[in-house]
Amino acid sequence: MARIAGVDIPRDKRVVISLTYIYGVGRSTAQEILAKANVSENTRVRDLTEEELGRIRSAVEEFKVEGDLRREVSLNIKRLIEIGAYRGIRHRRGLPVRGQNTKNNSRTRKGPRRTVANKKK
């Protein structure tokens, strides 16, 4: 397995797909990286030379990926919580942040249902 940005990328997949295993790199960013590194998208990772891997690594270093990106996202969320912004309050309460309806849905953010027992008469 080739190691790029601290992530083992799969050997048997095409390079453009393998790069998406890095946090912060999607398909379009992977294509951009390969264009800068002058490497074909259809090449398999196992067929890459050390020189090509080096060019890909240097192209990836220009982007904010993995630990730096995760840290930036978490700091942004902490900042929203500290300043008391509406989005920060939604993060703190574990509710959807982007205005989604919460009457029936949003189970992913809320977690499993907590049923409330009926009051006895």
UniProtKB/Swiss-Prot annotation:
Residues 94-121 are annotated as: Disordered. Pfam families: Ribosomal_S13. GO terms for biological process: translation. GO terms for molecular function: rRNA binding; structural constituent of ribosome; tRNA binding. Located at the top of the head of the 30S subunit, it contacts several helices of the 16S rRNA. In the 70S ribosome it contacts the 23S rRNA (bridge B1a) and protein L5 of the 50S subunit (bridge B1b), connecting the 2 subunits; these bridges are implicated in subunit movement. Contacts the tRNAs in the A and P-sites. Belongs to the universal ribosomal protein uS13 family. PANTHER family: 30S RIBOSOMAL PROTEIN S13/40S RIBOSOMAL PROTEIN S18, SMALL RIBOSOMAL SUBUNIT PROTEIN US13M. One of its GO terms (cellular component) is small ribosomal subunit. This is Small ribosomal subunit protein uS13. It comes from Halalkalibacterium halodurans (strain ATCC BAA-125 / DSM 18197 / FERM 7344 / JCM 9153 / C-125). The keyword Chaperone does not apply. Part of the 30S ribosomal subunit. Forms a loose heterodimer with protein S19. Forms two bridges to the 50S subunit in the 70S ribosome. The keyword rRNA-binding applies. Keywords: Ribonucleoprotein, Ribosomal protein, RNA-binding, rRNA-binding, tRNA-binding.
